[in-house]
Amino acid sequence: MADHPGILFKNGPSGRRAALAYGPDVWEVVKVLREVDERGPVAIAAAAEILSLDVSRVTLAVDYYSDYQEEIDAEIAAADEASERAEHAWRVQRQLIA
């Protein structure tokens, strides 16, 4: 992708997703950034450490997010919903066999 070198697209059950080349999806990087307590460059460094990425790769994800915020926010929402459904199913199963 010419505007965002280092970003590629993966196909999967949830559709086409922006991702770092040889790395996590952009939405995963953004989600980690939202969850760290730090802000600014320290937040980027913290996310890089958590994800075992170079700071420059986290910055690539941030740059992509700044241009496609709505798309990435929708992917985060979909992932959160899928996680909640899976946890609910697990709890129901545990109650059934408890």
Stretch-by-stretch model annotation:
Residues 7-28:
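Short, Lys/Arg-enriched anionic-surface-contact patches
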Residues 23-40:
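Short, amphipathic alpha-helical "recognition" segments used to contact nucleic acids or chromatin
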Residues 46-49:
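Short alpha-helical "recognition helix" segments of helix-turn-helix
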Residues 55-67:
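Major-groove recognition helix of helix-turn-helix-like DNA-binding domains
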Residues 71-86:
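Short Lys/Arg-enriched helix C-cap and helix-to-coil transition segments
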Residues 88-98:
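Short, functional C-terminal segments
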